[in-house]
């Protein structure tokens, strides 16, 4: 749906809403541009009021300082899943009034939270260059198979994601990954599997590096954020994604505790969570809708690049927020020592 038509449709949802200034905070970049086109402009055209977009880098401390000082100037903030859980526990966010947002049954289960609404799904996946690798890898076992697929592998320098991928490569079913990794033997098994691949690993730390490695021919496969591969494809690069065993996570909309524009903030969250708005967003960046009804409004080409499409999500693993909150510090310390050897 074009923004102008989306705006017209929203007039029903925002019938007599006073003009107000709403401050919406996100991470900027291509995601921020997609939100501006799909959400901000449509909201303003529908009479919802003026939106001021602010970029940040996920600094929870800024939200905490506002809330504790009772001087809240941010109305809606995009947060990552660990910050959602921590901020909710600390009382930094308003409770979400789902009766004003939408039908919970329409959303992915992970998108429904007492303090937030999942706004998009992103995934860490396996990627390769279709011009350089004619036989497509189909699972993490292929990523580890340097005889069948000779060459370097790009991997994010950290324990997170890599330990999960290692266990899947070693035959652990997706549904059992965190159950196995939570044990001493399971962690040992994951590090042992990583050690097998270590001579062939080229580490990356910035999200822009994996597609650069592929295009330059430095690696034959790499882990990558799906949105980065999508951006390279839009630039004409023939990069491909293997979705099997990808690890997905969500970003969420929250309202800082004490926002003076709570009603307007709820209306914005409801609009940006609607099927039409989320479908428009997904056309501009390949992050998946959390409202399942949005998928019916997208063509096959767009669906094929989304983590939330049925074909791409059927063998995916949801990022274990609780697991990494409990064991992340120890595993990252162990990984750093292992990587330095």
Indicate where each model-derived feature is located.
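N-terminal signal peptide c-region/cleavage motif recognized by signal peptidases
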Residues: 13-15
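Early extracytoplasmic/lumenal segment of secretory-pathway proteins
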Residues: 19-86
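Extracytoplasmic ligand-binding site segments that recognize negatively charged/polar headgroups
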Residues: 29-36, 73-74, 79-211, 215
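A ligand-binding cleft/hinge motif common to bilobed small-molecule-binding domains
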Residues: 84-86, 221-238
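Periplasmic-binding protein-like
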Residues: 106, 122-124, 148-162, 187-196, 233-259, 272-294, ...
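A bilobed periplasmic-binding-protein/Venus flytrap-type ligand-binding module shared by bacterial periplasmic
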Residues: 125-132, 167-169, 250-264, 271, ...
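C-terminal capping/gating helix-and-loop segments adjacent to ligand/active sites or protein-protein/ligand interfaces
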Residues: 279-341
